[in-house]
Amino acid sequence: ACRQFAMANPQALYHYDLHTAIRPSHRERFALYPFVEGRTVPVDQRDFLLEAEVETLLLQHKAGTTFSSFSSSLLKAESFTMELGKVRPFGQNDLGRFSGIQDALRRRFRGLPSPAPQPPFDHLTVFEVVHEILNTGKNFRFHIPDDVANFTEYQPGTVIWEDDETSYRVGHSPE
């Protein structure tokens, strides 16, 4: 269905895969930009993220298995996976916290560009993924508790994960 849609709509495609996080985060809202060889984030997409009150962007270092990776690599869409804050129990979510993404999407649907970034959402902090964690099987051990926030800095020597054959330990600089 996605391929048919892309073929029927040859103009620019945009895909924003919106999520709320289960894990806490030191950066409440962030986006992941799927890796596509030679591609950079267009200025209008950076402006869109800031209008949506997303101030943190992670650049993935290789193709992934997410829906946004599929749509960017195979359908040539400008795609992001966007984490919009921590989910609360049903009925306890403050919908006002989603006004940024709501306004940005409404403007996009009308075909209007994002306004020039304004404080406090006028700077996008960009990180590059350097290592990904993949569950390698039955003897995989992940050493980060579920209640540790995303974007926590780990000191050199910290073991992040291991299995019977290998492990990932933070190198000489904090990560």
Sequence positions of predicted segments:
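Structured catalytic-domain cores with a bias toward divalent-metal coordination
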Residues: 1-175
